[in-house]
Design a protein with these regions (language model features):
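Sec-dependent N-terminal signal peptides
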Residues: 4-13
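Contiguous interface-forming segments/domains that mediate binding rather than catalysis
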Residues: 21-22, 39, 69-74, 82, ...
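C-terminal partner/receptor-binding element of secreted or periplasmic proteins
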Residues: 77-112
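N-terminal secretory signal peptides
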Residues: 19-61
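Flexible, solvent-exposed short loops/turns enriched in glycine
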Residues: 54-87
Length: 112
């Protein structure tokens, strides 16, 4: 009887753990200097419910949307976030343009 009650008490918390968004940290060293798109040495990537992809600044914990789903969540007030351009680096090979987020979007999608 005690085991059944304990199991019933732990069951809801196990679902919460499974539903929690995954977060990984990526660095300039890991991704390569040529692909690195940010003004910081490392950032965190996460996938929130609905495949909303965000970059997180680990020192401030500010999150930045990197796909349309995430941007819509920020625009609607469902999530907090700042424009990604704040931490996006200029592309040295294409003056006036920012670095591509494609490798980071691809990596963040693996967390969904």
């Amino acid at each position: 009887m005690k085991r059944i009650i304990l199991s019933l008490l732990l069951l809801p918390s196990s679902g919460i753990a499974l539903a929690a968004p995954q977060v990984i940290t990526v660095s300039r060293f890991e991704m390569g200097k040529e692909k690195w798109a940010f003004t910081r040495e490392e950032v965190m990537l996460t996938c929130r419910p609905g495949k909303a992809l965000f970059v997180i600044n680990p020192s401030t914990l500010v999150q930045y949307p990197i796909n349309d789903v995430a941007q819509k969540r920020v625009d609607s007030g469902e999530s907090k976030g700042q424009p990604i351009d704040i931490i996006l680096a200029d592309d040295p090979n294409n003056p006036g343009q920012k670095m591509s987020l494609a490798p980071f979007i691809e990596r963040a999608q693996t967390l969904c």
